[in-house]
Amino acid sequence: LCAAQADIVQTVGSTSGLEISRAPGQDKFQAYALQTFSGEQVAAPMLEGCVAWLECRLLPEPGNHQQYDLFLAEVIAAQADARVFSDGRWHFEGHDELRTLHHVAGGHFLKIGDPVDGKILLV
């Protein structure tokens, strides 16, 4: 998700999917007219407007699922928006609205900031 999507992220994330699903044939994608496309490897909708997508295969771990509500997955495909990702790196300069969005709490988000390069220190 990117900074341009903060409002819809907050709205969809604050809405109960259970409440929406009580209407026949409704889910959050339909209720909020979220546009999707098909993944390359997994039969799951990929949300349009993001800057990256991961397709995953669930790793069955029933104990983790039941005891901790924890799900583990293996990434089997990845895509990224070429406007901000190339040569194995993110390049957000000039695309502030596409900076990745990170939820903090209570409707507050951070977007990824300026790059900082580290140097190897000699000891």
Predicted segments with their positions:
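Basic, polyanion-binding surface patches
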Residues: 1-123
